[in-house]
Amino acid sequence: MSSNGWLQIGLLLALVFLTIKPLGLYIACVFEGQRTFLSPILGPLERLLLRISGVDARREQGWLAYTLAMLAFNAAGFLALYGILRLQAYLPYNPQGFAGMTPDLAFNTAISFVTNTNWQAYSGEQSASHFSQMAGLAVQNFLSAATGIAIALAVTRAFARSAANTLGNFWVDMTRSTLYLLLPMSIVLALVFVWMGIPQTLDASVTATTLDGAQQTIALGPIASQEAIKQLGTNGGGFFNANAAHPFENPSAISDYFNILAMMSITMALIYAFGKMVGDLRQGWALIASVAVLLIAGIAAVYIAETAGNPIHLALGLDPSFGNMEGKEVRFGQAMSAAYTAITTGISNGGVNTMHGSLTPLGGLVPLFLIQLGEILPGGVGSGLYGLIVFCVLTVFVAGLMVGRTPEFLGKKIEAREMKFAMLAVLVLPFAILGFSAIAAVLPNALASLGNAGPHGLSEILYAYTSAAGNNGSAFAGLSANTAWYNTTLGISMALGRFAYAVPVLAIAGSLAAKTKGTASAGTFPTHTPLFVGLLVAIIIILGGLQYFPALALGPIAEHVGMLAGTLY
């Protein structure tokens, strides 16, 4: 731990905050139907696509129609991607001659990319053809991100409108998210990545001669284009098995900075756009502040834990100045490895430049806990915002109980119907995480996949289901997850974490949109003050995190105590 490391982290966060307002204003303009600098180019294309699809942009949908359209679209995307993965041996652009994926692996992978999880039970450079990567996985990187943005927009309109029966048009929101936001930013970022040395080619591989004269075959492919949307869409699935630790995905410290900035840009700007669209920028900044408090605390915790190192190694006389460098790339160092670890799990990206299974017990506890909080720091593109709004609803309800008034948020009364749906959404994650983890912890077939015994083995299981249900996608890689049990149950967990959460959220949006927007009075609890920020942070920790404490005590916490006693697993 050094002042230079803290300076790197501080500079990174400062750059992120500089992008929030301009990008947030642009997003608000796009989805409020205002003219932007891209409108002359993309406006005619948008109208053409909607006309071909038979979509009337002026015809809006109620919450149920919006929800059914979202579910139908994602079901079609799942079937299309499943078919591509199963049939890739017969499809073009397969220079490696890869066979089709097995049914359970194709099921897992298709759900993974449709739900924006990008959990990968396969090695990309050894299992997925160029066609599967480009026409299958990369396409879903765009569509899953656009789906999250669309749901977030529907929730935003619920607070912006008064006595309304509609939330917008799902097809229009999807089209605009892709055309005006994801595609332009991805094109620019992909070109930047190519300039930085990330390959973009249809060649299968290149043969290199090592220093000792041996021949080595290095996989290639359309990497830069996939890397761009992987980060901007908070997808996280890598072209290579090593993900952003691979030099062809993340060749330098500068590219590492761009990767982190890209993964944070849209999801943070959406919170600002929320404030702009509901007519209260103070609310947007309050939500950003609550996210920043927890995310910065997570970064600091990982950095401190990893630079402290392993006391068993220190007792053997190893140099303490390096800390725990196992599983880390020296071109990034401790500070940026810690920042990437906390941010990728707080954001629901799931890409890694550090192997999370090699973190110290407390260092590994932090990313696990950040996912369990609900992926709202600031979470995935779109999904983080609507997840954060659920916790805002819970927070004002608790505040209302304390002062004896009907809770309100942004002029909308929060009543029994909204609370029921909010609690239903909040209970989805612990049900999927703890339920499947408990079964896997006693099932012989599941236990056979463990790479480590003791508390770390339990942590591997817990992290896998946490990552799947939280739609994150990162892993403790000691778990061999490419089995029928894990492919199936993790796939179910991913679907629950995405759709069983989104449906109650859209139901809340429909209920709130129909209500008349009231004006604030002297007795209204203000939701843009430091008091609200503190209460929101407390509710997130209590309701989002403490329900997992018994499981964490048996996993990473027990492993940490054992490490202090001289035991490793």
From Swiss-Prot:
GO terms for molecular function: P-type potassium transmembrane transporter activity; potassium ion binding. It is found in: Cell inner membrane. The chain crosses the membrane at residues 11-31, 64-84, 135-155, 179-199, 258-278, 285-305, 384-404, 423-443, 490-510, 531-551. The system is composed of three essential subunits: KdpA, KdpB and KdpC. Keywords: Cell inner membrane, Cell membrane, Ion transport, Membrane, Potassium, Potassium transport, Transmembrane, Transmembrane helix, Transport. Belongs to the KdpA family. GO terms for cellular component: plasma membrane. It holds the Pfam family KdpA. It comes from the Bacteria. Its main location: membrane. It is a multi-pass membrane protein. The keyword Secreted does not apply. This is Potassium-transporting ATPase potassium-binding subunit. The gene is kdpA. Part of the high-affinity ATP-driven potassium transport (or Kdp) system, which catalyzes the hydrolysis of ATP coupled with the electrogenic transport of potassium into the cytoplasm. This subunit binds the periplasmic potassium ions and delivers the ions to the membrane domain of KdpB through an intramembrane tunnel.
